[in-house]
Amino acid sequence: MKPGTKNSYNSLSEIDIQGKKFKYYSLENAEKNGLDGISRLPKSLKVLLENLLRYEDDLSVTKKQIEAIKEWLKDKKSKTEIAYRPARVLLQDYTGIPAVADLAAMREAVKNKKKDPEKINPLSAVDLVIDHSVQVDQSAKSDSFEKNVEIEFKRNSERYSFLKWGQQAFDNFRIVPPGTGICHQVNLEYLSKLTW
């Protein structure tokens, strides 16, 4: 997802790490340039503020939304809605299958209007971990895990074929197959990135 076109608080900064330059949105610079007191915000609101600074465009993210985060310091509440854009979305199969079906339906609708259906893709990276359809059919044997996964693939072959199609059809979309682990474990051990 591309950053916004505005930089109202001159927070866009650059850091050099071992000769490689990286851009980031500095809360310290934003505080010096009009967002007084934001260093006192709770960490959770600092994450939201950095996200708003990154995507400020005067359309979906406005200066008013950014200032609402700062104003939270006064009353410890806000009625302003903000447009949070996560860098990545983690789904498990029960929420992911309907999402893929929605994307497929949107592509079909775009195609019916004689437009390019390939333009329909997730804006943020999506990782879908298939972990909620495993059932225990065999236990207490050395090959129980392998047998349960084999049965799982037979039982849900149509669903898995659909998800495999989705992974091939859409950009920014990865599938983690069943038998790999639960979504939170897989996320922490394999998928999550420290920086974007």
Cite the ranges covered by each PLM segment.
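Fe-S-dependent hydro-lyases/dehydratases of central metabolism
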Residues: 1-196
